[in-house]
C-alpha cells in the first residue's frame, strides 16, 4: 500500500505542507521536526520520487595494484562520462580508498546522496568490501565487480569464457604445453579467468604443470621482475602462456 504525505501528517501531527517541505529538504523546517518526519516516513516505508541529477563515478581502491596501471579503466571511465553527458547528466568522479581513515565517512556521504546515481568501479573489491554498499539510499550499478553474497545490478566482463577462448586458441594452434602467468593479487576477475584456463586445459587433456605457473606482480614493472626471476629459475618452459590481463602480459 502506498504511503501518503497525509498519512505521515496524521501520525506526526505536522501539517501536510510541513511534511512535504521536510521530505524535500526545503528551508523552514527545523532539525527536530525534520528528524521526526523522516523517522516516521521510514517506518511506514515511504518512498520519495527519485530525481537523479548527476552520475557519481566511484573508483574503489584497495591497493591500486590493478587499476593504477590498467589501460582498460580509463576507456571505461571515458565511456561512462560520454554516455551520461549524452543523456543530460553531469558526471562527478571520486576515489575511495579502503585504507583511508576517512573511508567510512566518504562512502556514507556518497551513498546517502539521493540526487546521484552511483557507478561503482569494483575491480579491486573483495567479498568483504560489499556489505556497506547494500545500505545505499541511491541507485548503484557495479562495474567490473560482483558479490557472491549480495545482489547488485552489475556490468561485467565474461571472465571465464574470455579466458577459455584465449586458451582454446592456443590449443587450436597445436600448443601442448601451455603455461599460466597469474597475478599475485587475486581479484575476483583473475580467479574466474583461472577457472576458464583450467576448464579448457582439462577438456583438451593438457597437463597443468606447477612448474609452468608463474606468479608475478600486477604492475608492468613488478610483472617484469617476477617473470624474469621465474625464467631464471625455470630450465624448461612451455611453448605458450596465458596471462591474467594485458598489463601482466606486457610486463
What positions do the PLM features span?
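Alpha-helical recognition/docking segments in bacterial nutrient-uptake
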Residues: 54-168, 172, 230-232, 236
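N-terminal helix-turn-helix DNA-binding module of bacterial transcription factors
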Residues: 1-53
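Short glycine/serine/threonine/alanine-rich loop segments
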Residues: 14, 46, 88-89, 138, ...
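Periplasmic-binding protein-like
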Residues: 115-122, 179-181, 213, 234-248
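Hinge/beta->alpha junction and helix N-cap segments in small-molecule ligand-binding domains
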Residues: 61-75, 93-102, 155-165, 181-202, ...
